[in-house]
Amino acid sequence: MNGDRAGGGRPLALITGASSGIGYELARLFAEHGHDLVVNAEDERLEHAARRLRETGVEVRAVRADLRTAEGVDRLVAALTGLTVDVAALNAGVGQGGAFVDTDPRDDQSVIDLNVSSTVRLAKPLLRDMVARGVGRLMFTSSVAATMPGSFQSVYNASKSFVQSFAQALQKEVADTGVTVTSFMPGPTETDFFRRAGMTDTKVGTMDKDDPAQIARQAYDAVMKGRGKLVTGSAKTKAQGVADKVLPDRVKAAVHRRMAEPGSATEDGAAAGDGAATEDGGR
């Protein structure tokens, strides 16, 4: 990092979890506003996404790497060597549904590795470089889940609480450096998140969800204005964000349980199973 610009001097944006959902929509917005891109995801859809993004006329580098692993994080950091990253959107995440006593410990660890560990490991070199240059924008995909105890999504909600606290702490640390840190908090979003997290039999998994393009637009506007944090999405999601500030944790936990309990979408309570799945900006 802290080197040349590609594409004739255009600013460069890094987006993780960019193969679909909010991450892809963020990448599209940055491209349409004249940013070259480095896009990352761990799945095969990344190359297709990169081809579509190149149609905007900017330079797009696709780095396929699994950020749940130290090797994947190192691969992405190495790909940034010699580049000046003007905006970094740390968006990749993984979701998991089910009772904590029933979920696979490996899935629990996968949530922690991607949502927490990779976020910290990537933020360090990116923020160091931005502070050294006295300019830059760092953004985190948090979640409204960060504001409530997540019964039947316990590790996931806790991981998003970490991201939110981490982002707000960094905001104050770099307040006088010329660097801004933004965290945005989407609610349930129309992506593969709930299907891949084994939550299609839950109330939250079957309810109407927000448009990832709308969320990305609000997040893009916020980071370019240097805002600290915001709840993104529909009026309903934003109202939830307001309510979460005043409701007791026990009430929020009870509501979350009713929405996320396996089988809650059906009268007979038949469960579709647990699982962890790559989010790429789902919720």
Provide a role label for each language-model segment:
Residues 99-101, 107-112:
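Substrate-binding pocket helix/loop in short-chain dehydrogenase/reductase
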Residues 33-48:
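Conserved glycine-rich Rossmann-like NAD(P)H-binding loop of the short-chain dehydrogenase/reductase
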Residues 183, 203-240, 274:
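C-terminal helical subdomain
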Residues 19-20:
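Conserved glycine-rich cofactor-binding loop
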Residues 143:
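Residue(s) in the substrate-gating loop at a strand-loop-helix junction
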Residues 54-71:
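Rossmann-fold cofactor-recognition segment
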Residues 123, 159:
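Active-site helix of classical SDR
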